[in-house]
């Protein structure tokens, strides 16, 4: 009788624990309601292809696979955890035909038509830059470009050495491997690189692009993996890491900013106003006022970094408004990242491209080039006054990934989303620097 009572108590405790288990903060029965609703929608192929339908699908899917990725041994430490799990599964759902066309359209409308990615990045840039000490921000930005250049030099040297080991000429290594990897992603990197290649050499842009995007895809995977590894190294050797802070404050003496008072929802709303208006101004400058400087196009996110930095330096924003912008940024990065990663997997990840590019030589060369970017940026950053881990992530890995979505994947893998502003400088301004280098390299081949 006693054994039966104990067994009954154990069963009740197990059931109670199961009911209290939470997925994305929701008790299991409540999440089950959301999941069953989504499955009904999938079964009847009835989902609105607007923001409501898209966000419902992205929230529910992101929640379950985020929890799995967060808990899965090895994957959560070495591969990138929840965010990487989410976008890989989402990409597989498209590849395997599990998603219906309506579901793909709903997510695509959120990501492409409504451009949720732009809003996400704009909010993170504003919160990240406004939360930095004004004088420290100026000094760090001035030192960041040389760190990017150090990363490019490191990637080039490592790439040339490994290329020669495979019998590949120096010009081909630079043209087909180093420049696409370090060029700022797809739209701001591989696409304009193929145009420059065609205009300078007269050769096929399509042939160049297909090779460049394959190499870039492999490098992006290594960038994510290395980001997770660098996070682990930073935890073991704490003197190498600023735990999300780029600048070694001992190297840049500054006075502390004034402390913020009470923060209300209104200050948080002002953070949204500043995020959207600064983005709007950056867009106008990039598209109409200064579409190019010296023949090189500057992306609107690069302009936005400079605009928000100028706003911070102007003293127009009170400590409360800065704190409100930071609170909004934290909400987006902590509560909406899993949602965004579903969209990244559906709209920006092609598993077939990854599979096609997986040759032994391509994998080894791409990996070594990314290592070179990390080493170069770490050494350059240390000499400037930055922490090696943070400088290698932002000026190294965020140069070697696939641009805006790659920045989010890399930073989420190493738990450093607050470094998004520096990541965007790498992807945008750094990508522009690579385009200039490409013009010179391609002209030498003619």
UniProtKB/Swiss-Prot annotation:
Membrane topology: Multi-pass membrane protein
Recorded family membership: Belongs to the 2-hydroxycarboxylate transporter (2-HCT) (TC 2.A.24) family.
Name of the protein: Citrate/sodium symporter
Keyword Nuclease: no
Pfam families associated with the record: 2HCT
GO CC terms: plasma membrane
Assembly information from the UniProt record: Homodimer.
GO biological process: citrate metabolic process; sodium ion transport
Sequence positions that bind Na(+): 181, 183, 399, 401
Reaction equation(s) it catalyzes: citrate(out) + 2 Na(+)(out) = citrate(in) + 2 Na(+)(in)
Role played: Secondary active transporter that catalyzes the uptake of citrate across the membrane with the concomitant uptake of sodium.
Transmembrane segment boundaries: 23-43, 46-66, 79-99, 110-130, 148-168, 213-233, 267-287, 289-309, 335-355, 364-384, 425-445
Lineage: Bacteria, Pseudomonadati, Pseudomonadota, Gammaproteobacteria, Enterobacterales
Organism: Salmonella typhimurium (strain LT2 / SGSC1412 / ATCC 700720)
